Curated annotation (Swiss-Prot):
Matching SMART domains: ZnF_C2HC (SM00343), ZnF_C3H1 (SM00356)
Quaternary structure and interacting proteins, as annotated: Component of the cleavage and polyadenylation specificity factor (CPSF) complex, composed of CPSF1, CPSF2, CPSF3, CPSF4 and FIP1L1. Interacts with FIP1L1.
Biased segments, Low complexity type: 175-193
GO biological process terms, semicolon-separated: mRNA processing
GO molecular function: RNA binding; zinc ion binding
Name of the protein in question: Cleavage and polyadenylation specificity factor subunit 4
Keyword Chaperone listed: no
Chief subcellular location: nucleus
Keyword Transport found: no
Zinc fingers (CCHC-type), renumbered ranges: 217-234
UniProt cross-references to PROSITE patterns, sorted A to Z: ZF_C3H1, ZF_CCHC
A GO-annotated cellular component: mRNA cleavage and polyadenylation specificity factor complex
Amino acid sequence: MQEIIASVDHIKFDLEIAVEQQLGAQPLPFPGMDKSGAAVCEFFLKAACGKGGMCPFRHISGEKTVVCKHWLRGLCKKGDQCEFLHEYDMTKMPECYFYSKFGECSNKECPFLHIDPESKIKDCPWYDRGFCKHGPLCRHRHTRRVICVNYLVGFCPEGPSCKFMHPRFELPMGTTEQPPLPQQTQPPTKRTPQVIGVMQSQNSSAGSRGPRPLEQVTCYKCGEKGHYANRCTKGHLAFLSGQ
């Protein structure tokens, strides 16, 4: 009715201008105060707020998808710098630990999300391709679908909204499993008497090796021969004095 009599879209009251320009808004007495009940700062959204941490309005940056669990208890000290959402939104609550760990939660009024474990299971790329060697023991989900005949022929007019399956014959990167290569078995080589004699002589020479005589041992502490370093009585700096 008021639009028929006279349009007031071009009229702006002083109160609306004061709210938009934040006239009369006093800065906070100290930074880090709880501003969860305050409005969003319009100047910060335009990168034009000069009050910084003393601004009485909320500074929201980026897309925050999870509610801050410390803010729910009134214990979050980060304020606007918190990377989580300071807003009670049931769709953005963190996942319930007890339901995800044990499959049940005794709290009838649990504020956290109860996500069905089956919804977390990913589809098996091998089964979607046509065959999975793990069968029912596969840790991924095997979903039975009816293949679209038009897509197999070459073109489906329904596109992504088709109720039948459009198979994808390529596998995602990082999920391909290559079967182990068969080990190349070599026939055992026959040892001739000459080879056996050489091996026996090598084993006997290796077994006959013992500690070297003291005349060939040089002490690295004093530089003299005739004893090991752990038996040296002249100290570890004896080679500097030339003793």
